[in-house]
Amino acid sequence: AASPNDPLVLREAGAFHYRKGDMSRADGLLRQAMRIDPRDYMASFFYARMLDETGRQAQASQYYKEVLRYVPEDAEVHEAYARSLGKTGDSAGAYIHMAYSALYSNNKKQAERYFNQAKALSGKANPREFQKLEAAYKERKEIWDKN
């Protein structure tokens, strides 16, 4: 039987309560899972989403960034982070992460659309963030154009 202090058990219980909408239970369980295993990026992802859904986008942003260090090509994480940034009014950042989400989902049409929107707002974005997106987009576009 699994131990109640097993970080996987805590993460899954936290995710269960998050999905049910019981954010206070999810909060405690996910924080406990992250304390025991700080590298459990799935616990951090659910925690970021829980923070985001409870109006704490600034805190959520730190966790989304941490998760992306572990799984930089995860389309779902980029999409969730984009939606969170959109709630704060950071349209440039939101479009950058929506473009990544489309790139990593291999959705050429959406990637082009979001990349162009990010490019139009690039003056308001972190220049390094946009340059990284531009490089990833060009690399993926070359592959798409060959096929």
Regions found by a protein language model. Name each.
Residues V9, A43, V77, A94, ...:
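TPR alpha-solenoid repeat register
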Residues Q32-A33, E66-V67, S101, Q117-A118:
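Canonical positions in the second alpha-helix
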